[in-house]
């Protein structure tokens, strides 16, 4: 997170992935593109960008890297199951209201691209009794147009 007292504020987002081919004798591939370094850590009002915005940027960047990796896989490398090191739902509640829908739409578009590339996406449930599980189950039962 940017330090408001630093001489030169910045932040970086580092994304990595591991491709494991179940049943194959090939060793897993690791992929770590150059980090996304941001020297403009201020929002439109000149305030330091919030940790919530950085988290959303990271989550979107993870899906973009995942899509890039999916498009590089051999055609016979199916089925593909992806596991994100976080919850599946994008946390936008901490963003300013006017950004929430925009970021959610970006996230859904990226998830659609993952699906169009023939992959399934999974995350983890860190609190099984939380409302996240119920919310995801409710979303799963809706038609795509209703989401």
Language-model segments: residues:
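Acidic, metal-ligating active-site segments
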Residues: 1-47
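Long, contiguous domain-sized segments
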Residues: 40-147
